[in-house]
């Protein structure tokens, strides 16, 4: 068992009686902290965790870590002294938390990949796992918006345990204590390859610090999360800073057709030249790409493509909908190329044709009358725009968009209404998670932006039903915003709801 002296804390403190105190864990939560755990008090937007010090100690905290800028009330200082609980003031508790978590949970899977970007993260991590599995690398798992997932049945017990810890509506990137605990658990359960999502908030709050990544990637950057970041410069630089966590001589994978690709290249060469990264760029618009997309021939449900990898040409097929899915697949291929020998490149290319659509990502369900229903997460304007543009290419009839926003989202998210109105022939407004707002209130916001949108009804189910009933042969319906999510939050409580189940139920009753 670890003691306080096992960590980086100075041993020459005047108060030496606590050096050998047993430590059983770490916690950010004063209510859930267990006996002999370290309480890490983090400053939030509205409160400082130091305010919960007494509660943490009463629940068993053996030590407190706080921000050195925190103002500690006299009664808290007296309480610490009375209980003989050490207090450590540090420059950044979240950085300290990551360092401490790495000591407490030291083991990690051998190959850890991290993907960041505005759109495509969940699809890329799933496609990467699929590709590894198809090539015979079976000890795989993913961690992100969809929780902890794996195609290996021997990890089902681990999957259930981890998802029990992180809950039904997990953060894209878990807090650093939970994340390191998951990595440690995964290692001891036999996971060798783990692909994880890195959100901008998770990067900014040092949740992904102290992780031994083998490859990190950037899919794309478009306007999002400006309530958190303020400006696109801050948002993009936060995304770029993921690569500062990547050890030297490891691999960077990125979309060279994205408008932020040049800025990322400059960042890598100017800010991190000493790291000597291996670079794998993919795209259509530069002959300097390590994965060059030469030719794309599309049909309704996929693409025949020609690509050049490290100066050698290959042909393959992708049975995925949407040209942006080609980019997602190329990113997955880039991750795989970062760890396989060159004599397995042909196998990797051959397996691309076996990749399947990710749940809730342009997932196709056919109606009885010949209309196509596509379910896509597309929870921000840029993702919705890409999905609708791709549907226009393959749709002979009308595009019917069932679109909405979550309660309390920023004005940029409200732009989804404008995007839907621009690209769809029929727009039916609904909600994603109404939280404490009514459907009428949320729909009214959208109709102010695009008055031509139809009211979808009191429930998301009703909006989907309206779309399916009006659809004819050759039409495409896009249902956006929920994707893989199996719950809607209403009045603070999660309510089971899954778009594919709703669609199938409605079709079965036609």
Region spans (language model):
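ATP-dependent carboxylate-amine ligase
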Residues: 1-14, 22, 35-38, 44, ...
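Alpha-helical segments flanking ligand/cofactor-binding loops in enzyme cores
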Residues: 31, 54-55, 184, 233, ...
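Receiver (REC) domain switch/active-site residues of two-component response regulators
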Residues: 62, 214, 425
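Short secondary-structure boundary segments
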Residues: 66-69, 198, 220, 431, ...
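Adenine nucleotide phosphate-binding catalytic loops in nucleotide-utilizing enzymes
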Residues: 229-236, 240, 250, 254, ...
């Amino acid at each position: 068992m670890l003691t306080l002296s096992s960590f980086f804390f100075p041993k020459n403190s005047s108060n030496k009686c606590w050096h050998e105190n047993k430590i059983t864990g770490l916690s950010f939560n004063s209510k859930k902290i267990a006996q002999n755990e370290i309480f890490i008090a983090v400053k939030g937007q509205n409160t400082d965790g130091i305010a919960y010090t007494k509660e943490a100690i009463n629940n068993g905290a053996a030590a407190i870590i706080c921000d050195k800028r925190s103002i500690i009330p006299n009664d808290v200082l007296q309480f610490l002294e009375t209980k003989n609980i050490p207090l450590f003031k540090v420059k950044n508790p979240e950085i300290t938390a990551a360092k401490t978590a790495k000591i407490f949970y030291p083991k990690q899977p051998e190959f850890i990949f991290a993907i960041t970007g505005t759109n495509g993260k969940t699809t890329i991590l799933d496609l990467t796992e699929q590709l590894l599995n198809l090539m015979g690398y079976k000890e795989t798992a993913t961690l992100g918006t969809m929780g902890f997932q794996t195609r290996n049945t021997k990890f089902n017990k681990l999957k259930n345990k981890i998802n029990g810890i992180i809950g039904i509506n997990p953060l894209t990137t878990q807090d650093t204590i939970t994340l390191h605990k998951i990595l440690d658990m995964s290692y001891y359960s036999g996971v060798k390859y783990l692909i994880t999502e890195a959100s901008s908030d998770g990067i900014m709050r040092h949740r992904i610090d102290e992780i031994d990544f083998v490859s990190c990637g950037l899919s794309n950057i478009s306007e999002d999360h400006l309530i958190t970041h303020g400006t696109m410069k801050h948002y993009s630089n936060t995304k770029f800073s993921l690569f500062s966590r990547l050890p030297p001589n490891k691999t960077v994978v990125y979309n060279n057709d994205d408008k932020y690709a040049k800025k990322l290249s400059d960042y890598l060469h100017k800010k991190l030249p000493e790291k000597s990264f291996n670079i794998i760029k993919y795209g259509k618009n530069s002959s300097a790409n390590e994965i060059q997309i030469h030719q794309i021939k599309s049909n309704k449900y996929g693409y025949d493509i020609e690509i050049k990898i490290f100066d050698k040409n290959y042909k393959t097929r992708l049975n995925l909908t949407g040209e942006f899915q080609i980019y997602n697949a190329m990113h997955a291929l880039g991750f795989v190329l970062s760890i396989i020998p060159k004599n397995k490149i042909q196998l990797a290319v051959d397996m691309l044709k076996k990749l399947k659509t990710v749940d809730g990502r342009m997932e196709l369900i056919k109606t009885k009358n010949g209309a196509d229903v596509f379910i896509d997460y597309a929870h921000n304007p840029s993702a919705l725009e890409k999905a609708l543009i791709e549907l226009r290419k393959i749709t002979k009839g009308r595009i019917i968009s069932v679109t909405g926003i979550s309660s309390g989202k920023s004005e940029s998210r409200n732009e989804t209404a404008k995007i839907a109105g621009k690209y769809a022939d029929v727009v039916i407004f609904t909600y994603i998670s109404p939280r404490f707002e009514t459907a009428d209130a949320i729909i009214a916001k959208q109709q102010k932006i695009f008055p031509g949108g139809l009211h979808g009804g009191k429930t998301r189910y009703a909006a989907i039903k309206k779309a399916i009933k009006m659809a004819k042969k050759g039409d495409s319906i896009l249902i956006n915003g929920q994707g893989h999510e199996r719950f809607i939050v209403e009045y603070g409580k999660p309510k089971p709801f899954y778009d594919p189940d709703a669609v199938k139920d409605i079709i079965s009753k036609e």
